[in-house]
Regions:
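Phosphate-group recognition and catalysis centered on beta-loop-alpha active-site segments
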Residues: 2-159
Length: 159
């Protein structure tokens, strides 16, 4: 009887060991989905200089990043009229010099402001995706000022 219990205990131990090894194995599907990020430097908010014609989170900064082989990290949030735009801050003070929240303005209202005195405007996420055209890895940060669900759904729909 002891021999049977030893056999059962050994079988359970080997089963648990096998299960542990299976659970710790590299996930090839997940590994493949992140392969684009291997050895790719990421340009945070694009390849920008806020004292030039390529301020952060602008089409010019993203164009420079793509042209120089960088991946891109960017921030998206919704305007008052539900347009998904690329912009980091919740207010426009630092980048546009006005005391308003992005979520208080429509996209048409945002178009009248330039980024850091350049000719660049706050871009629509769709315009950035058109510019990038799948040529480089993209890290999208969802900025939520008021509606996480709508912002996330809008970004997911475009991706």
């Amino acid at each position: 009887m002891i021999l049977v219990w030893l056999f059962v205990a050994a079988a359970i131990l080997f089963g648990l060991l096998g299960l542990s090894l299976y659970m710790l194995r590299p996930e090839t599907e997940k590994t493949r989905s992140f392969a684009a990020f291997d050895h790719t430097m990421i340009a945070h908010r694009g390849l920008f200089d806020n004292h030039s014609e390529a301020p952060e989170n602008s089409l010019a900064a993203f164009r420079k990043a793509v042209d120089q082989g960088f991946g891109i990290e960017l921030d998206v949030q919704l305007t008052k009229d539900g347009k998904l735009v690329v912009f980091h801050d919740f207010d426009l003070k630092r980048m546009c010099g006005i005391h308003k929240k992005l979520t208080e303005l429509t996209y048409a209202e945002l178009e009248q402001y330039s980024l850091k005195g350049s000719t660049e405007k706050i871009p629509l996420f769709s315009a950035v995706l058109d510019l990038i055209a799948g040529r480089t890895p993209l890290v999208v940060e969802i900025k939520v000022g008021y509606d996480y669900k709508a912002t996330t759904e809008a970004a997911a729909e475009m991706l």
